[in-house]
Amino acid sequence: MSRRSGVRLVALAVLAAVVAGCASVPAESEGGGRVAETICEFSREAEPEGLSGITRIGGSRYNSVDDRGGFLHELEIVQDESGEIVSCEVKRSVRLQGRTDLEGCAYDPFDGRIWVSDEHDTTICAFDPETGREVSRAAVPEVYRKNVVANKSFEGLTISPDGYRMYVTNEDTLKCDGRVADDLRGGTVRIQEFVRAGKGAKWEPTRQFRYQTDRVEGSRFSGLAISGVAGLCALEDGTLLVLEREMSQKSPLFPSFRARLYEIDLNADSNEPQKRLVWEENTMFANYEGICLGPKLKSGMRSLILVSDGGGNADENLLVLALFGEK
């Protein structure tokens, strides 16, 4: 969604296990679930604005896309051993051929290409990150193109760490699935799975999951109530992290945002997986839209990076969280 009140990157540290000397797992995570908590906040330069998706390409290097000019930006995000972000610098920007409203992006571990989801024309295409030239595209089921609601098409995109699975989702309910989310009820989005045999093989659409989003909780003033899925992140164990984002009018002057991170198990024998809340925050002007895996830290934690696309005059921040209770 093209709303920019500042850009935030969020690093989440993921504990594979609780080891001696580490903080104890919060009580809420007992029983195997994940729980995230804040570590620190970091402020970055204002440009480029409108970042809406992010993916790690190796080391401290990341690619991010914007939803205004169709650019792919290479970022260097440096973290210290504890996971705190030390710096964030834009290294280069490349315009992607024929793109205008980019929302999600995912690094292909087989060939280094970058796959992106475009909200404008409901496509998933691969690009050469050096030239910006389109080199491939995935076959998208017709149900999406025929039923998307304006400005609520493809948002989150992720490729599994092993490179064999890709997932994409629409932001809010398709026309054929009912009403979009509002302050009375949540919506239903479809998470589409693609699989391939290996390097050079085409993505084939396979399973489709129905995911229930939250209703808008903060709409005190009329005219603004939006809730939906903004980002996806596939983990090694078959779990999918789902980033939900709400925008509502809590005052007569300014909108505010709320972010929630859920986990769903795609190994379960159901096309309607149950979701479990692992983190949420009333983020004011920070509009979280993208999420990706980051590096492992010295403590054994795995970081995640989230990017926030707002719209207006908010600060550009980086926020570090820790995610406890890894399965």
Show the residue positions of the predicted features.
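Secretory targeting and sorting signals
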Residues: 4-26
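Sequence/structural signature of beta-propeller domains
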Residues: 22-327
